[in-house]
């Protein structure tokens, strides 16, 4: 699945840049009352990037598991008044623990950190997204 084709993601205006990163252009459609990027639009970009890094990290599980966002923490550092880019990351330890849990139990939790940066490279927002992922029982979906 291409995350930028998810209807909500399209509606928000999240795009992929030439470096393959997810970004949110600065335009009136995502502005708040202060004419900066709305908090919910920043959250949408960060959450989408967190899901995509898991999809890329575990591409062999696509169609075999259901990922659900279980918990999130977000901190807005400075107003975003330019295009912003998402920079997601997962620690090697978390990746290893996830692989072990999903293999042994058929379900696992994993946390993804995301930094949003403006065109000057300044941090506008940070977030941690905890995903619950469970294997699909045969015949359960599709």
Ranges and model annotations:
Residues 6-37, 56:
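Catalytic strand-loop segment that frames the active site of acyl-thioester-processing enzymes
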Residues 39, 43-47, 51:
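Compact, glycine-rich, soluble single-domain proteins
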Residues 19-23, 71, 83-85, 109-111, ...:
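Intrinsic-disorder/low-complexity, polar/charged segments enriched in Ser/Thr/Lys/Arg/Asp/Glu/Gln
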Residues 27-31, 48-51, 92-95:
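Short, charged/polar surface micro-motifs in flexible loops or helix N-caps
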């Amino acid at each position: 699945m291409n995350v930028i084709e998810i209807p909500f993601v399209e509606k928000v205006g999240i795009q992929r840049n030439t470096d393959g990163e997810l970004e949110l252009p600065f335009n009136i459609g995502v502005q708040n009352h202060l004419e900066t990027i709305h908090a919910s639009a920043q959250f949408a970009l960060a959450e989408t990037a967190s899901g995509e890094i898991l999809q890329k990290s575990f591409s062999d599980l696509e169609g075999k598991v259901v990922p659900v966002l279980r918990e999130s923490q977000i901190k807005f550092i400075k107003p975003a008044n330019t295009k912003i880019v998402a920079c997601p990351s997962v620690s090697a330890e978390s990746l290893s623990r996830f692989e072990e849990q999903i293999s042994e139990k058929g379900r696992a939790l994993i946390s993804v950190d995301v930094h949003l940066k403006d065109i000057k490279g300044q941090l506008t927002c940070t977030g941690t997204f905890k995903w619950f992922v469970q294997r699909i029982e045969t015949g359960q979906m599709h």
